[in-house]
Amino acid sequence: VNVLKTPLVSVVIPTYNHGHFLGRALQSVLDQTYTNWEAIVIDNHSTDNTDEIVQSFTDPRISLLKINNNGVIAASRNAGIVAAKGVWIAFLDSDDWWISDKLYECLKNQNDKVDFFYHDLKLIRESSSFFQMRIKKSRQLNKPILIDLLVGGNIISNSSVIVRKSLLEKINGIDESNDMIGCEDYNTWLRLAQITDAFYYVPKTLGYYLFHRSGISRKDMSVAMKYAITSFIPLLNCRQKNKVESLLKYTKARHAFLECNYSEIRQELLFCMAYASLSIKCKSIYMFISVFLKSKYGASH
C-alpha cells in the first residue's frame, strides 16, 4: 500500500478474561494493509489463557501490559494511551475486530485538518445458537460537533475511533469515575469536541462489534449517560435540553422494556413522544403500543 504519510498508529486493546476473543482482534490488526502500527494489549490480570494468546503472536509490534483496573476499563485505556508511541491512537475492544483495510481507509484521508476518524461497524448479535447481523451506522456530525453529539446521542463506536494522541493528552485522557462506566467513551468524544470540530466520518463498514449478553450492553445506561453529559447541558437551549432528556428517558425505558418491567415506562415514553427526535419518537410509539398490548392481553413476555 502506497500511503504517502504513514505515521505510527498505536492500537489500544483493553482486555479481561477474553482470551477466546482476543486472538481474533489481534489477528485483525496483524492483517492490516497499513503496516506502521503497534498494538498494546492492556490486561486486567486475566485468569484465562490471555497470556498464551498474546504470546502466540510473535510479531514484535504487539506488547502486553498488566494493570489492576478495579473494574474500570477507562483505566486500562489510559494506561495504553500513556504507553503509546504513536501520533494516532486507535481503540479496539478485545471482542471486536477490524477488516484488513480499516487503518488505511481512515488514514488515507489524514491531513492537518483532521483530528478524529470514525466509521460504521457490523453488529454481530451473539445468541444461543446463531449470529444476527446488522450495521451500527454512524453519520457525519454537524458543526458544532459537541451540540450534535449531545442532542443526537452517541453515534460513535469505540472500536471505530482513531484520534490524535496529543488531543487525548490535552483532555487528560478518559474519565475513570465509577459513575460513568459504560459511557466513558461518549464523555471522551464530548470533551474532545470541546477542543476540536475536526471529526471525519468514513462512510464504510470497517469492522465488527460483538453484542453479547454478559456485556455492558445489557445494563441500564441512562444513569451513566447522565453523568457523561451533565456538565455540557448548560450549553443547550430549551428545545435541545428536551431532546437530550428524551434520549435519557428512552434509554431507561428501553432497558425496562427488555427486562419486561413495563409498569414504570409509560411516563418516560409519553415524554419521548412529545419531545424526542423523529427516530426516537417512532421507536417510543412502537414501544408504547407494545407495552399497551402486553398489559391489555396479559402477556408477560
Locate the predicted segments by residue.
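Short aromatic/hydrophobic "clamp" motif used to bind/position activated sugar donors
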Residues: 89
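N-proximal low-complexity "stem/linker" segments adjacent to membrane-targeting elements
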Residues: 1-30
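A conserved acidic beta->alpha catalytic loop
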Residues: 28, 35, 43-52, 69, ...
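Catalytic core of nucleotide-sugar-dependent glycosyltransferases
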Residues: 205-213, 217-243, 264-274
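Conserved donor NDP-sugar-binding/catalytic core segment of glycosyltransferases
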Residues: 101-132
